[in-house]
């Protein structure tokens, strides 16, 4: 299996690093961000049906049937574009989501989460069942969202303590803000900046994927997941290290934006950034400009630093 993984690694390093979590048995699925793109216009039909549903002109059955059609269409497209995943025993699985996993209240316009895993298991299908129960009013929105987050946490191999911390943050201080402040106060951002400027690689194992907020940078369970992936990657462990550094610095870029806000949180971040050199700020500003295409930037950066992007 590692031979096949090695053969395809440089086609998309970020995607390869994501799926390594499955191949080393650290998770059943991964949810790559900004890699498996959806064509424009793909949401037109589901958006219209969702509008009808919200206005009482369509039933839940009709909305879910439209979601099934969209998922089938997207899976066909994704399998064409990422057919090499089959050589690794993996395939993409598009799942339509109506309930925001980020916002604390309300529905969202239909969105698609694109998982990658070995096959569509019962737990993956359970996500749609929970979404349906929420839409039908059979389960309260807040409790339903919590159930969705716990299900996804299991599928993605996230430690229970980290999932629980994220769910709890929905009732108070956001998990991203808490984690960013911890990284600023405990030297994670500074350590990553120093390493990058001196052309050194360091491992930040709890940052094994983007959009994951460990309950603490000292969470031994999150660290254990990252180290397991890093060990399995063998000759590609430097790519894991470099990506973990970039994930940390993209969080620093988020912090830089947040430092412009009023309030105690913004004030603390302004104090942190005032301690950095103009060169450090400039580097973070560069990453901030690429926050919208983080995966693409990371792929190119890994290729430039480690080489071999055109191989395979």
Curated annotation (Swiss-Prot):
In terms of InterPro entries, this protein maps to: DUF483
Query: Which Pfam family, just one, is annotated for this protein?
Result: DUF483
Q: What are the record keywords, sorted?
A: Coiled coil
Q: Which residues form a coiled coil?
A: 44-89
User: So which domain of life are we looking at?
Assistant: Archaea
Q: What is the protein name for this chain?
A: Uncharacterized protein AF_0426
- Tell me what organism the protein belongs to: Archaeoglobus fulgidus (strain ATCC 49558 / DSM 4304 / JCM 9628 / NBRC 100126 / VC-16)
